[in-house]
């Protein structure tokens, strides 16, 4: 599984989380993995660990995004854009293995694929403030 595929899975897992109660999270993650055609137990474990790490830092991530997005409240942002930025912010601030430029570029690519017409530029603008 490539890093891009890992990011896409993590984005989908974060996005899915938005529509379920916290008590259903574990079950929803299992449903997500069941929906995938080919994923090894090792890949599933890796995704689980990364997903858990992101969730552990979610409060800090949201604070960083709120500070970077003056004029925008997180609860008013599109769920696609928000979760792409959460993933990228985790990589930028808490994952030393991912270069900042790569995290931003990958977030822009996810925004182009899953977001609306202005998502890529919106995500880019907010993430530029995250790295300042």
UniProtKB/Swiss-Prot annotation:
Involved in transcription antitermination. Required for transcription of ribosomal RNA (rRNA) genes. Binds specifically to the boxA antiterminator sequence of the ribosomal RNA (rrn) operons. Keywords: RNA-binding, Transcription, Transcription antitermination, Transcription regulation. GO terms for biological process: DNA-templated transcription termination; transcription antitermination. This is Transcription antitermination protein NusB. It comes from the Bacteria. GO terms for molecular function: RNA binding. Pfam families: NusB. One of its GO terms (cellular component) is cytosol. It comes from Lachnoclostridium phytofermentans (strain ATCC 700394 / DSM 18823 / ISDg) (Clostridium phytofermentans). Belongs to the NusB family. The gene is nusB.
């Amino acid at each position: 599984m490539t890093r891009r595929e890992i990011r896409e899975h993590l984005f989908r897992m974060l996005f899915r989380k938005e529509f379920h109660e916290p008590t259903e999270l574990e079950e929803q993650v299992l449903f997500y993995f069941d929906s995938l055609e080919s994923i090894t137990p090792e890949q599933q474990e890796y995704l689980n660990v990364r997903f858990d790490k992101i969730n552990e830092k979610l409060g800090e991530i949201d604070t960083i995004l709120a500070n970077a997005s003056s004029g925008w409240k997180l609860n008013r942002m599109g769920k696609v854009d928000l979760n792409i930025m959460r993933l990228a912010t985790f990589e930028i601030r808490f994952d030393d293995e991912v270069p900042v430029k790569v995290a931003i570029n990958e977030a822009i690519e996810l925004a182009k694929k899953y977001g609306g017409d202005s998502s890529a530029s919106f995500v880019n603008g907010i993430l530029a403030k995250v790295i300042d």
